[in-house]
Amino acid sequence: MIRQTKTENGLVRGIEAADPRITAFRGVPFAAPPTGKNRWRAPQPCENWEGIKDCARFAPISVQDTPGIGDSLYNREWHVDQDVPMDEDCLYLNIWTGAKSVDDRRPVLVWYFGGGYQWGYTREMEFDGERLARQGVVVVTVNYRVNVFGFLSHPQLTKEQPEAPSNFGSLDQKAGLEWVVRNIANFGGDPNKITIAGQSCLLYTSDAADD
């Protein structure tokens, strides 16, 4: 099993999943924190780190409103657990792999959560990739900015960054996918066999992706 491996920015250590044949790498950074000077900007490259980064826990989710538990199925689905930490520093992804070595070259599924660009996060129980990883797939779930931090439209922001007007969350999704292409081989995945999937509004991502 691959319990420790390298990324382009440094070494990471995963954790044994409930099924000991699967390793989960949670909270792997794929871009610099979108805070301070990086707020409302396209995602910037992640800095290198020394030593081994412990990737046993999920990273905080993107800052978002909590719609609460109402009568509708939609509100009940997207009720944000009050115990889940939120932070602007949220550009992390999670990987589940059952590969025995980096030479396995298993097919890869990259999953994006939906939520009307307002809510959602990768640590929801239904997005846990362990079960699918048992079938020989390397599963990746990508966090991205939502709500005002991901899709705020303002003339000043458009003036400063005409190449990315109001679509910072979409650029996060693209950056996550590009990171997967560059790094997934070190988790036993095949960068030439990547399937993109999404829920609700994020179904468009698979159609928007190019070579």
How does the language model describe each region?
Residues M1-N167:
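Non-catalytic accessory segments of hydrolases
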Residues A99, R182-N183, F187:
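Generic structural signal for alpha-helix termini and adjacent loop/cap motifs
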Residues V102-R105, F187-P191:
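Short helix-terminating capping/connector loops at secondary-structure junctions
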Residues M125-G129, S170-Q173, L177, L203:
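Amphipathic alpha-helical segments in well-structured domains
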Residues R145-V148, A197-C201:
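Short, solvent-exposed turn/loop segments enriched in Gly/Ser/Thr/Pro and often Arg
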Residues A164-I184:
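Alpha/beta-hydrolase active-site loop
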Residues G189-Q199:
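Alpha/beta-hydrolase fold nucleophile elbow
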Residues Y204-D211:
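Conserved small/polar residues in nucleotide/adenosyl-binding loops
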